[in-house]
């Protein structure tokens, strides 16, 4: 007599998971990149805690969304994704939908939707919930949303995990509240922490805080990127070079600046030269939009759909902005750190053979 294996105990095979990938990307021959399957296997078959350190554009979100799809099909609870930026959440929700995953977010921009989303979470109708680390400091969220479902969370994802460490370049104190959340979860709940920009010191700090976590570390080289340094001694020469070079660069791109003033100044200059450019920074507003978040989302969509040539942005446009065919990233001034530079140039060339 053949014994039936419950769906939550059946081992997922690579070929089955790869079929989910193919459905998501619409490519019948798509295959996992190096080490993607190993990370998925760690989540769904071995139920481990894993810190994934892989280059920008490698496909870290594919790992946790395919894992979510598998775990939900096995009857597990929702995936909780802690993510630092609204732009990142919007991109992730769209990526989840391609896998048939119902993803929702509770954040400062959708307060009117909170009661409906909360009820759907309690009824187990949501596959993935995306929140900011600051949401973990909200007592009503913890008591009304998190505590009632904590014992059945299927997967915890900590995106941009370098933010946990006070040695990290984007340290966010509320990320450390994750330690309290971990205590609420069943012991065998898998955890996936992801980053592209953690040095050895940050990795050791994350391991210390998340405890008993394995590390999977890949090469950080991006072969599709052609990097150049141009010695331009003053502002006038930099502006002149931008006006000459940007029309000749392929596709659309981002010019990174250090300040709000620079963003407005450079965007105005480029527009005067006939280049369709918009300034992007924290708090940027437009009379036609209700608030800054709505206008920033509009600007992101303009670039995503190639309706403008370039965004002139501060680091407000950073982690998580995902435009696979972004053709170029230019730094008008040197960024604050090498890690910030790596994060920002990593916006370009994710799904094209050559970017600048």
Residue positions per predicted region:
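Interdomain "pre-motor" coupling segment immediately N-terminal to P-loop NTPase/helicase cores
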Residues: 2-9
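Helicase motor core with emphasis on the C-terminal RecA-like subdomain
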Residues: 9-11, 20-23, 34, 38-61, ...
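Nucleotide 5′-phosphate-binding alpha/beta core
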Residues: 14
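Short acidic-aromatic active-site loops that bind/stabilize oxyanions
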Residues: 29-33
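Hydrophobic alpha-helical transmembrane segments of integral membrane proteins
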Residues: 80-81
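Conserved Rossmann-like nucleotide-cofactor binding loop
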Residues: 87
